[in-house]
Amino acid sequence: MAELATIARPYAEALFRVAKAADLNSWANLVSEMAQVAANPDVYALAHNPKVSDDLISSTFISALKSPVGAEAKNFINMLVQNDRLTLLPEIATQFHALKNAQEGAADAEIVSAFELSSAQLTELVATLEKKFGRKLNPTVTVDGALIGGVRVVVGDEVLDTSVRAKLQQMQVALTA
């Protein structure tokens, strides 16, 4: 895994420099979409098929994208295909978004809730979490009924677990100690 990160880093940094000079948010959306397409097993098989030309791989990949693809993005995709690095796009996207978050002073927040959150609840929760963590958060919300109640929040390497399940586990540890 560390090897993939090492290989992907220069690509992510170069792409980030290009995106900074243009519209960073539209590039971030395009990079996310490219990563999703590249993660598809059919794309992996196509990219590693020696009978398929680089031009065909590039054009097929570009046609699979819903977002408009500019000249810089086409050049980037062509370069990845020529260097057999197209399947690195998910890791490149991860590093690209980390660079974007660092520039914006933001962080990705993975919020796991026991129940579906309304938009008002989510807005209030994110505002509270932004105060606690001291930076802007980009939330991703999932629902896990196993939490019983409450939420579990992961921001970078920090975890805030206020779920009922976590409280029960703490009580179990305290009672068995």
Swiss-Prot record:
| Pfam family for this entry, one | OSCP
Gene3D superfamilies attached to this UniProt entry: N-terminal domain of the delta subunit of the F1F0-ATP synthase
Name the predominant localization.
membrane
Q: Name one GO molecular function term.
A: proton-transporting ATP synthase activity, rotational mechanism
Q: How does it sit in the membrane?
A: Peripheral membrane protein
Keywords tagged on the record: ATP synthesis, Cell inner membrane, Cell membrane, CF(1), Hydrogen ion transport, Ion transport, Membrane, Transport
Where does this polypeptide localize?
Cell inner membrane
GO cellular component entries: plasma membrane; proton-transporting ATP synthase complex
Concerning InterPro entries, the annotation shows:
ATP_synth_OSCP/delta_N_sf, ATPase_OSCP/dsu
Could you give the subunit structure recorded for this chain? F-type ATPases have 2 components, F(1) - the catalytic core - and F(0) - the membrane proton channel. F(1) has five subunits: alpha(3), beta(3), gamma(1), delta(1), epsilon(1). F(0) has three main subunits: a(1), b(2) and c(10-14). The alpha and beta chains form an alternating ring which encloses part of the gamma chain. F(1) is attached to F(0) by a central stalk formed by the gamma and epsilon chains, while a peripheral stalk is formed by the delta and b chains.
Report the function annotation for this chain.
F(1)F(0) ATP synthase produces ATP from ADP in the presence of a proton or sodium gradient. F-type ATPases consist of two structural domains, F(1) containing the extramembraneous catalytic core and F(0) containing the membrane proton channel, linked together by a central stalk and a peripheral stalk. During catalysis, ATP synthesis in the catalytic domain of F(1) is coupled via a rotary mechanism of the central stalk subunits to proton translocation. This protein is part of the stalk that links CF(0) to CF(1). It either transmits conformational changes from CF(0) to CF(1) or is implicated in proton conduction.
Among PANTHER family, the record links this protein to: ATP SYNTHASE DELTA CHAIN
User: What family is this protein classified in?
Assistant: Belongs to the ATPase delta chain family.
Report the protein name in the record.
ATP synthase subunit delta
Q: Which organism is it from?
A: Janthinobacterium sp. (strain Marseille) (Minibacterium massiliensis)
